[in-house]
């Protein structure tokens, strides 16, 4: 938390990798960020088309009024259920809003509540999120390209690369991003526009004769962040969980801790 230069809930993994590299006296790390954005590796590429298709098939008179939606959201929250279910009716008809629903942890109404609870006078409407993201996708040929652009702008650039920057620098590690390369982008985009189905496996197969077999055949490994365990560890098991997903509680915890360190 002391080394954060902006609040984030997603930097723990990059920090851990950088810290481990530092301990083992490594100087440079490679990261594959950018691959999921270009090769449609995220769930959003399958979910958003399905969400928008289903929500636009519903009769117009089934749209719930804001009054009932807020009641529904409150019910979901009180019972520690996923409030995004209510958000489907409000944000599920267009690719831009469905993307926000897919990527965000909280609904805009919940964010406003969090800001107010932390004595922040900023109104969520002042951020002009919806108009901005709607303008971003105007003129794109198809939904896949729209999602690629949104993933690159709002997740890769606004979050992942920022997290990689401060977490690696705070551990004196150089983090290289070979897939975030303008020349590589220009080579791939025409294939995407032509609707040729390409995935990360196709990129990997390009190196089948250039990589040692023990690397080429090695199974992918990964790890997840134990949000619940971390919260209990930081608070001596005194944390009162409010949400169905511990990552939501972890995000608020990171936000509040960042503010407290910033004040000091």
Regions found by a protein language model. Give the residues of each.
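Adenosyl-5′-phosphate
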Residues: 28, 83-264
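Short intrinsically disordered, low-complexity coil segments enriched in acidic
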Residues: 1-5, 72, 243-246, 250
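Catalytic metal-binding/acid-base residues of hydrolase active sites
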Residues: 34-36
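ATP-dependent adenylation/nucleotidyltransferase module used to activate substrates
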Residues: 9-32, 156
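A mobile, often basic/glycine-rich helix-loop segment
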Residues: 38-63
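ATP-dependent adenylate-handling ligase core
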Residues: 1-18, 44-52, 190-195
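Alpha-helical "lid/cap" subdomains adjacent to substrate-binding clefts that gate access
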Residues: 58-81
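A polyampholytic, Gly/Pro-enriched intrinsically disordered region
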Residues: 3-9, 75-79, 238-240
């Amino acid at each position: 938390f002391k080394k954060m230069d902006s609040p984030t809930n997603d930097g723990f993994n990059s920090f851990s990798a950088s810290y481990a590299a530092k301990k083992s006296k490594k100087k440079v790390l490679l990261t594959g960020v950018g691959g999921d954005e270009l090769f449609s590796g995220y769930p959003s590429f399958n979910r958003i088309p399905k969400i928008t298709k289903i929500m636009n098939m519903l009769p117009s008179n089934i749209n719930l009024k804001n009054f009932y939606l807020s009641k529904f959201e409150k019910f979901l929250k009180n019972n520690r259920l996923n409030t995004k279910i209510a958000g489907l009716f409000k944000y599920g008809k267009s690719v831009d809003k469905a993307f926000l629903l897919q990527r965000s942890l909280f609904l805009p109404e919940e964010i406003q509540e969090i800001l107010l609870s932390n004595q922040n006078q900023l109104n969520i409407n002042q951020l002009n999120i919806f108009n901005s993201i709607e303008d971003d996708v105007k003129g794109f040929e198809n939904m896949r390209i729209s999602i690629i652009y949104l993933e690159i702008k709002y997740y890769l650039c606004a979050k992942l690369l920022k997290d990689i920057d401060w977490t690696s620098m705070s551990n004196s590690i150089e983090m290289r991003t070979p897939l975030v390369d303008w020349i590589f982008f220009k080579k791939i985009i025409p294939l995407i526009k032509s609707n040729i189905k390409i995935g990360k496996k196709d990129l990997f197969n390009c190196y089948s004769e250039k990589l040692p077999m023990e690397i080429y055949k090695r199974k992918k490994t990964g790890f997840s962040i134990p949000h619940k365990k971390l919260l209990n560890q930081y608070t001596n098991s005194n944390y009162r969980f409010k949400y169905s997903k511990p990552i939501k509680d972890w995000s608020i915890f990171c936000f509040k801790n960042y503010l407290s360190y910033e004040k000091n």
